[in-house]
Amino acid sequence: MAGTWIFVEQRDGNIRKVTFEMLSEAKKFGDEVAAVVFGKGVEALAPEFAKYGADKVYVVEDDVFANYNTGAYVAQMVAMINEFKPNAVLFAHTFNGRDFASRLAQKLQLGLATDAIKVEVSAGKGVFTRAIYAGKALAKVEVAGEPVLGTIRPGVCEVGNTAGAGAVVKPAVAATAADVYQTVKSFVPTVSARPELTEADVVVSGGRGCKGPDGIKLVEQLADLLGAAVGGSRASIDSGWLGHELQVGQTGKVVNPNLYVAAGISGAIQHLAGMSSSKFIAAINTDTEAPIFNVSDFGVVADLFKVIPTLVSELKK
């Protein structure tokens, strides 16, 4: 058996952080770890995967893989699974990852565990921990079969530094133009100077204490000066102050930046589950009993409407 495969999330050679997270996590299983990358001109990325634990890198290059395409990607992966027989194939729980994994599971007639926050894989079995009931409970889901299939939520695994050999393997191209039943006409990227939430080294999040759009504007000002991503608690998202794609928490996105600033966030357990692994946590809250202070490295008991303008003023100097 060929160990655990991690499907690489990349576009135009830009590798998403979740790929390195999954490679590092798979290294803990004690079996061979391989990165699987489809695309054009992607062989040059192989050394990057080796840095984070890939013992092998399966590289498949062809025009048919230039952009993500469900039919072609599934056809190629099925052929490779039949040839190399991995114990498990894991994907990021992203738009493409969810689509790919579910179509692959259907094609192979196998079970699939999705949106896992923890995973353990052994021969012929995978145990996936998932949040249920809006993050109020955790469920362990066992998936049997070979290979084990699952998707992992970005941000829940630590990026390690255990390197692998990174030996490049080039399987035959199995997908053909006949497998392509959707065509990508163009990509229209979101126009934002801020980093993506799960990729950022610094995150500044606002909660109920922001009291409305004016408070969120302060959070955004601070974030922009720090070169940070903007996030929010469920309260600020449900109030419509920030978009749902910016929710941090067990039912939103999990982040682990070098610095996490929580402004006006009390620290409900669901929110803490999404950011408590951050390297350094700074909190601003008027409530001395706010749970956020229990996980903070630095806390300020004060009104964010006074603290943030002062920080902004100092950072501009």
From Swiss-Prot:
Protein induction: Highly expressed during syntrophic growth with butyrate (at protein level). Seems to be constitutively expressed.
Superkingdom of the organism of origin: Bacteria
Sample GO molecular function, one term: flavin adenine dinucleotide binding
InterPro entries in alphabetical order: DHS-like_NAD/FAD-binding_dom, ETF_a/b_N, ETF_a/FixB, ETF_alpha_N, ETF_asu_C, ETF_asu_C_CS, Rossmann-like_a/b/a_fold
Compartment(s) where it occurs, according to its Swiss-Prot or TrEMBL record: Cytoplasm
Major subcellular site: cytoplasm
CDD domains listed in its UniProt record: ETF_alpha
Gene Ontology cellular-component terms listed: cytoplasm
Chain's role: Part of an electron transfer flavoprotein involved in syntrophic growth of S.wolfei with butyrate. Probably receives electrons from butyryl-CoA dehydrogenases, and transfers them to the membrane-bound quinone oxidoreductase Swol_0698.
PANTHER family for the chain: ELECTRON TRANSFER FLAVOPROTEIN ALPHA, ELECTRON TRANSFER FLAVOPROTEIN SUBUNIT ALPHA, MITOCHONDRIAL
Binding partners and assembly: Heterodimer of an alpha and a beta subunit.
Protein name (Swiss-Prot/TrEMBL): Electron transfer flavoprotein subunit alpha
High-level lineage: Bacteria, Bacillati, Bacillota, Clostridia, Eubacteriales
Gene name as annotated: etfA
